[in-house]
Amino acid sequence: MLHIVDDFDRQGFAVLPNFIESDCLQQVKEGCQQLVDNLAEQLYRDGVISELYSTEPFARRMICLFASHLDKTPTIFRPELHLPAFYDLFAHPKLLDLAKLVLGTEIRLYPNYSVRPKLPNDPRTEVLWHQDAGYTRTDVDALRMMNVWVPLVPANEENGCMQFIPESHRLGVVGHQKEEFYLQIDQEYLAPRMYSAIQIETMPGDAVIFSNL
């Protein structure tokens, strides 16, 4: 795993192909399906939808449920994730081993874990260029953090995948501006570096780790 740590330190991120076993990922997807079941049943009871779309595949069901009601689409699941279906991923042995290599043996899971559904043509799910540290204090770069992202469906340039600017973490915490839904890095930092931005296309089972900077 040392080459992963090297990529993380050098680029600010690292891609881990086929890192999460299918059984673990399936358990997470089933937990998400339960959350969507609950949403669908509530929408049906409220008369917002006339069918539950229960036979639609995992990757399409939320699109069907909210296609005509984008304003009701959840943009994030966070407190809902305190469920056993997610625990095996949170405490995945390979992720913990990697975290120890990156952060040292004293580690903690920051209680900000989330699932973000991304629906087509919904600006509330189009996350802008930012540093996670931009949402916290400016001196947070004194803390070493490792974020982990695991896709549940294929993520590519067409449907919207993660993007990174390699080595931009070396800038430390930079200025951000509040846009309608999210923070965005100030153009004085962003514009001169956009030429080096890369798309990170991933498949279920892959993982991406990245700096909060």
For each feature predicted by the language model, list its residue ranges.
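Double-stranded beta-helix
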Residues: 155-213
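A structural signal for short, well-ordered beta-strand segments and their strand-loop junctions
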Residues: 15-17, 108-112, 161-164, 209
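A short catalytic or substrate-binding loop motif that flags glycine-/basic-rich loops and adjacent residues
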Residues: 107, 140-144, 155-156
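Non-heme Fe(II)-dependent double-stranded beta-helix
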Residues: 2-10, 17-129
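Acidic, His- and aromatic-enriched active-site or binding-groove loops in soluble protein domains
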Residues: 127-145
